[in-house]
């Protein structure tokens, strides 16, 4: 059992126990020692003087332990079962949204992920004021919930869940706690209090420009352009969506770059600015061969969706150029 008063993790493993008992060990020290032990069985011996010996092969550690009575009790959460979902599906949902969680402690509700369950689907949402990530999957929920789970908890859940759709994880929740139960692990966590943004209100309706493009090709183009962008030189990418192609430009004190690739563009031609990292995060987490970008206006959030289906929706805010953003109707090119 591990518990830091905000999150607790309980796991059970098979062992040849010669004498039952309880001790408390430094978690980080124990983890580092075990990870560096030679392959094979590990023996743990605790003495009455508070010394604990951990041995594997010829490697042997002796460390100070603490009394189990000093360890805080896990709370009785009273959480009610809400839904069951394949572990691989939940892990994928978490991994595809965590990048957009806010780091701004002044808005604590946005430092976690919104879990929203309806009778037939689970939605996970993250946002930081510059981008928004929404992933939905079909489920059969016993109870509808709307809770905010700390990003630290989500990281641990993702790390511990098997990437296997044959195994399942049971999610239980109430107004204060959430509990994830799967084969081998139980993870409980306090929830974040506060009101999560009504994200539906920030999603643009319709679009003036729709672009279907190859995800890998777009990522590689942005990565090349990003070579002249540094933490000190954060000039935006200037990206033009025109008939049949996407043109990426950037200029900093290190130099300038122009690159392009073919794409299926419909509607008005547009040139718009992007933070390279924010756009890359959305594209890398799309995990699909082609994406569709929908642009409603020069200063409106840009939607990134799968070319087919609707299992995710990412929003990326554009960056205003020092001069004005350009938004024009198509015109013949030389």
Short names for language-model regions:
Residues 330-334:
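A short, hydrophobic C-terminal helix/tail in secreted or cell-surface proteins
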Residues 1-329:
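Structural preference for solvent-exposed beta-strand-turn elements
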């Amino acid at each position: 059992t591990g518990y830091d008063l905000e999150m607790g993790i309980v796991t059970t493993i098979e062992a040849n126990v010669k004498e039952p008992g309880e001790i408390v060990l430094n978690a980080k020290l124990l983890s580092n020692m075990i990870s560096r032990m030679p392959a094979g069985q590990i023996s743990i011996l605790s003495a009455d003087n508070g010394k604990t010996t951990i041995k594997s092969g010829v490697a042997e550690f002796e460390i100070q332990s603490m009394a189990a009575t000093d360890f805080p009790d896990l709370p009785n959460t009273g959480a009610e079962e809400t839904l069951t979902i394949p572990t691989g599906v939940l892990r994928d949902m978490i991994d595809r949204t965590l990048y957009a969680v806010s780091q701004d402690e002044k808005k604590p509700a946005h430092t976690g992920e919104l879990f929203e369950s309806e009778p037939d689907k689970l939605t996970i949402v993250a946002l930081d004021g510059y981008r928004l990530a929404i992933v939905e999957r079909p489920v059969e929920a016993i109870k509808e919930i709307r809770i905010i789970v700390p990003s630290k908890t989500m990281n641990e859940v993702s790390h511990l869940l098997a990437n296997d759709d044959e195994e399942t994880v049971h999610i239980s929740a109430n107004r204060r706690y959430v509990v994830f139960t799967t084969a081998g692990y139980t993870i409980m966590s306090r929830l974040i209090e506060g009101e999560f943004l009504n994200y539906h209100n920030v999603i643009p309706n319709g679009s003036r420009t729709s672009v279907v493009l190859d995800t890998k090709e777009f990522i590689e183009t942005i990565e090349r352009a990003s070579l002249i962008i540094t933490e000190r030189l954060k000039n935006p990418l200037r990206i033009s969506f025109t008939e049949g192609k996407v043109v990426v430009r950037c200029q900093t004190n290190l130099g300038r770059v122009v690159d392009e690739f073919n794409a299926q563009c419909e509607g008005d031609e547009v040139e718009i600015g992007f933070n390279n990292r924010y756009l890359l995060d959305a594209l890398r987490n799309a995990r699909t061969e082609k994406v569709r970008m929908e642009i409603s206006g020069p200063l409106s959030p840009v939607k990134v969706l799968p070319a087919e289906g609707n299992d995710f929706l990412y929003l990326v805010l554009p960056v205003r150029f020092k001069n004005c953003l350009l938004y024009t109707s198509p015109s013949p090119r030389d």
